[in-house]
């Protein structure tokens, strides 16, 4: 295989080097955060809590006002019919995944993942005793025939998907595949765990989540505001039927018995006064420019080595590499050129290897993107025996 068998977590590699350009999974640029608005909202929350002697801990499901604001946002922007009692706040997406796994999964239950998928989600379910089954996928989404075959062979408990912007390939699942998946879920009675990455869409035709469908009682939906707010205020949320949400909340209490009331009150203010929407709109314009730049540079500088389709949503691009590229050597050469990327095997099941990489670009400014692509070009060309320096 051209792909190395092991890879250090991308979050640990050269992150401290100020001159090292790291293309990540697709996070936002923390330098664009509305720091004044955030600090003002936190100050308001602290003052309110002190004056009214409100405990620093809140309900296991989260602050009621925040849950109401989230419900209104989801129903207005994502076409859902969420009720406050169906929404639970969580400190992070990873904690949400683990709570869902602990709630839904019993030892040796079968859970389906795409062959290329979120590795941390895979680990969360495996840690809770799940047997992981891998399913193929293409440019329309999951292979429905493959899934139905698994349903015949095994008693499937759940499937994990990110249909809006598949991690890592960036593909959006087609409407037809979504309908077929919903039908299979109803027929074979398994849960759909929908991880919705919808914060930044560059088209006017963003698809609605599967949880917005009328028959979505078997869908557990999770999303996050951290994609918009970055690390300034980490918050994720789960939307599920009330009985499952109650069980998730019990698990969350065991993991994090001190839900951050200050942060949740601050986020509520930012949602209600429109600051989060304004920040998202401002950021989208900047990310659109960065998206156009990296697409232009990839076409101009790396077209002989890669193939890609520019996605309509998300903040990353999936690059399929030429068969002649040795991934292990490319990583080493890129490291020498002070540029990093996330290779396929970080996301791949053990039996599925593809020579590709994911380039998250939004956290980099235009100068950093340009420098990073130039350095990547050097790394690619070194495989041809050409020595260039960025």
What kind of region is each of these model predictions?
Residues 206-225, 246-247, 357-358:
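Conserved active-site segment immediately N-terminal to the catalytic lysine
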Residues 28, 163-166, 227:
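Short glycine-rich anion-binding loops that position phosphate/pyrophosphate groups of nucleotides
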Residues 1-43, 249, 253-259, 269, ...:
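N-terminal basic, amphipathic alpha-helical segments
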Residues 87, 190, 219, 306, ...:
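Short, conserved active-site loop motifs that form the nucleotide-linked donor/cofactor pocket
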Residues 47-188, 193, 200-214, 287, ...:
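Conserved core of the PLP fold type I
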Residues 347-351:
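AMP-binding (ANL) adenylation modules
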Residues 220-300, 308-309:
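PLP-dependent aminotransferase class I/II
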